[in-house]
Amino acid sequence: MANFHGLNSITLNPDDELPPLASGKIRLYNMRFCPYAERAVLYFAKKNVSVEVINVNLVDKPKWYLERNPLGKVPTIEHDGKIIYESAVVAEYLDDIFPDSSVLPKDPYLRAHQKILVERLSAISGAFYGLLRATADNQEAGIANLKKALDTAESLLTDNFYGGKSSGYADMLVWPHLERVEVLPLIRPDLHLDKLLGTDYPKLTAYIARMKELPEVKVAIRPAEHHVQFFDSYKTGKPDYNIGITAA
Amino acid sequence: MANFHGLNSITLNPDDELPPLASGKIRLYNMRFCPYAERAVLYFAKKNVSVEVINVNLVDKPKWYLERNPLGKVPTIEHDGKIIYESAVVAEYLDDIFPDSSVLPKDPYLRAHQKILVERLSAISGAFYGLLRATADNQEAGIANLKKALDTAESLLTDNFYGGKSSGYADMLVWPHLERVEVLPLIRPDLHLDKLLGTDYPKLTAYIARMKELPEVKVAIRPAEHHVQFFDSYKTGKPDYNIGITAA
């Protein structure tokens, strides 16, 4: 997408110098496999806002990154000396400064409703991370947890999208975790999750297919095999942040 | 305060009937000792918005409550058939429908900054709940955790309030947990936390004194001995939600 510059640029390490940011430009500090940062990528894509992406090593954090975000997490955006982080705060900030492309509805109740949906769907991320690390002792509880989260997601889907007829705020915020849930059977083949999504969640399955057709999702999504390779490297304590980057 | 009706009304149980809500009125479903519900109380008080309060038993949850909020948590507000929950969502909704008394600033960056402060100060609530339940095994780690959270809070306080010269959104959202941290030495005398706040955190100590002078805090705050009695009852699995209510 023409509005992204550097979405797949090489990840910067502590020894790398931070390129200067031109006045008026917006920069996104990103990690290519972080679902929270992906929320910001989806938002920039959906709003078609021009952005320069800096990919950051989150295990060995550059000093210049911690100076900008003391929590050391992604996403962070920088804009005329202003620093904004936390994925939901970044999304609202982008809507506030570019109101013409606001993803959040203007109506107070509909706005609140989108945020409540995100809260109710957040059980998916908890369940995903639980299963990612599940041991023989707790994998049964983890699978039950995921089923419960997906049951909720299935029941809350009453239209094409969580945003209604078109995709909205809740869709942008929940998608990155659903993308990873879909890949979980490949990341953890030992858990035998293959059929989990397909048969029990017809609405959610159709929703995932629908989401994959959205231009913003096409920008942000990573191939399943890259997710698998990333998590394999992550487990070793040395995540490979540059998986899938092809030499220029 | 004249705008509150029923802030200290008797807590309703599953067998109690829910009184009808008049059209145009706003109702807050509350639990008198819940810090998240207290955020909403502070917000209604600060904005001087008229509200009817229903106190709800959160151990034995009334069916009518779960129908309104499937998560069964407080605060929830009800307003002309609309249901809004999650404390931060409730606060923004109240600002959206009563913009003249908006607590959140209009400027996008200042808005974002208030929300980032809440995120950074949220370590206080985690540390508080950790110490509330601390055992001999983990109390040292719990105390270190609280100190770290308070160090951050001390360093982030660069003016009279987190909102700046006057109290703001971040103050309303962080206060309920600070109120409880101050009472922690009485709830858990075995942890010897008495001098924790007084000596190491001069800015925070002055801030707490300043907060207690605000009209909205005077409405929402509970006496230390009521917090202690509540937590003593909570530990038994039978929380006494009606501590401090005097017969009409």
Where do the language-model regions lie?
Chain A
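C-terminal/domain-terminus segments
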Residues: 224-240
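Short active-site alpha-helical segment characteristic of glycosyltransferases
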Residues: 79, 174, 207
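GST-like domain detector, emphasizing the conserved glutathione-binding G-site
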Residues: 1-166, 201, 236-238, 244-248
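GST superfamily/GST-like fold recognition
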Residues: 165-189, 200
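Surface-exposed helix-capping loop/turn segments at secondary-structure junctions
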Residues: 155-165, 187-188, 214-221
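Short helix/strand-bridging catalytic loops that position acidic/His residues to coordinate divalent metals
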Residues: 134, 189-197
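Hydrophobic/aromatic-lined pockets within catalytic cores
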Residues: 95-99, 122, 158, 177-178, ...
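A contiguous, mid-protein "functional segment" used to position or interact
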Residues: 198-228
